[in-house]
Amino acid sequence: MASQGTKRSYEQMETDGERQNATEIRASVGKMIDGIGRFYIQMCTELKLSDYEGRLIQNSLTIERMVLSAFDERRNKYLEEHPSAGKDPKKTGGPIYKRVDGKWMRELVLYDKEEIRRIWRQANNGDDATRGLTHMMIWHSNLNDTTYQRTRALVRTGMDPRMCSLMQGSTLPRRSGAAGAAVKGIGTMVMELIRMIKRGINDRNFWRGENGRKTRSAYERMCNILKGKFQTAAQRAMMDQVRESRNPGNAEIEDLIFSARSALILRGSVAHKSCLPACVYGPAVASGYDFEKEGYSLVGIDPFKLLQNSQVYSLIRPNENPAHKSQLVWMACHSAAFEDLRLLSFIRGTKVSPRGKLSTRGVQIASNENMDTMESSTLELRSRYWAIRTRSGGNTNQQRASAGQISVQPTFSVQRNLPFDKSTIMAAFTGNTEGRTSDMRAEIIRMMEGAKPEEVSFRGRGVFELSDEKATNPIVPSFDMSNEGSYFFGDNAEEYDN
């Protein structure tokens, strides 16, 4: 669908891939999972966690954070050069939750980063295993995408909060590499570029000198990544123009926002991978499962099978609904924050509700929250069917959508029509066709107007029974079109704050 310049699967991006065949890719991804699992087991031993405590998703998040922080070289360097009161740049840690006398207790742990790096490398046969680190970053990013709506960030860059379906990966760190770039949505790339251009407008030296050259090549690289996500010639031509601008300014920002809006109908290709918390991989490895030998894929049945047989627990606040907490984590596990809820309900086999209807806050517990009233419960992460993840945006068509999110970004390669509210989207395009790109703009608008309601995306693709490992019998779901398809529907999800 979208030529990413080089035709490499994202498993190959994930594996420094020289072209590998499917078996090699599966083994290579499996090796990465093994490493995360072994590291997690070792950390649970260090922290003296019981089996139950080791399967607590909050402990998993703390342990994942610790290793990500231990390997964050840029930040580590910054912390050493700008020492701040009460922060030891050589240490990392966080809250670990333990069950003591029938109650959950919070314990703050602190480790030398050097020690954490040693444990990580040891679990990964002496390598830095950057891919495993990126994998955990993408899991955190997917969890953020499911938990928070980035309204403020969108408004700050001059975009519209209704464009939230384009914001996948907006909290991924800069160092997340090619695998990270593959999962970023159109809006995320546009936002990064706008921030850059704004700095250039405010800071005369931003594009100048030795540093400016690096900045410029980063700018062009980001433009090319974004261009690779677009699937129409006119959208790509627009990106060439933004990239080649001598002195990027407001005209480029306008073009970028225009192209982001257009992506609500002429969707870009964004990769989706099921990245699971470390506390899923750990127990699987501990039970003797050899991911490298068996092979593993982030985009096929494997994560579904793994979740089918995993026990994960979560702390629950007094007025939260454990079923809703489960839905939040399930969606995060499958990178499905912007997928059509009707399809998700079908795959999961239970109703998937919009974010605003869920009685649950984020998975993490703040340090000032009272532990006395905390309970824990099992997260229900199993599914009825499985489906193949997609990296194409699907072709487009129209349906009434909501006040909040007005389009979807498909996660699963399954036949359906893709809802978006054409009248709302097109209203944003009235007027401003003058300016230097009018021909491209006119072409893009013409294509958007031509998008038809009856068009079906992913024709003939279906979901599969969990017993159908080779994906031989696709089941094409039928949907109740009267149901709401958007997750962030006129929503009150919390904001994401760093």
From Swiss-Prot:
Protein name per Swiss-Prot or TrEMBL: Nucleoprotein
The task this protein performs is described as: Encapsidates the negative strand viral RNA, protecting it from nucleases. The encapsidated genomic RNA is termed the ribonucleoprotein (RNP) and serves as template for transcription and replication. The RNP needs to be localized in the host nucleus to start an infectious cycle, but is too large to diffuse through the nuclear pore complex. NP comprises at least 2 nuclear localization signals that are responsible for the active RNP import into the nucleus through cellular importin alpha/beta pathway.
As annotated in the record, motif Bipartite nuclear localization signal runs over 198-216
Tell me, how does this one assemble? Answer: Homomultimerizes to form the nucleocapsid. May bind host exportin-1/XPO1. Binds to viral genomic RNA. Protein-RNA contacts are mediated by a combination of electrostatic interactions between positively charged residues and the phosphate backbone and planar interactions between aromatic side chains and bases.
Q: Which Pfam families does its entry note?
A: Flu_NP (PF00506)
Species in which this protein is naturally found: Influenza A virus (strain A/Texas/1/1977 H3N2)
Q: Which gene encodes it?
A: NP
UniProt GO BP: symbiont entry into host cell; viral penetration into host nucleus
Q: Where does this polypeptide localize?
A: Virion; Host nucleus
Q: Which family does it belong to?
A: Belongs to the influenza viruses nucleoprotein family.
SUPFAM superfamilies named among the record's database cross-references:
flu NP-like
Q: Where is this region: Disordered?
A: 1-21
Q: Where is the composition biased (Basic and acidic residues)?
A: 8-21
The UniProt PTM text for this protein says:
Late in virus-infected cells, may be cleaved from a 56-kDa protein to a 53-kDa protein by a cellular caspase. This cleavage might be a marker for the onset of apoptosis in infected cells or have a specific function in virus host interaction.
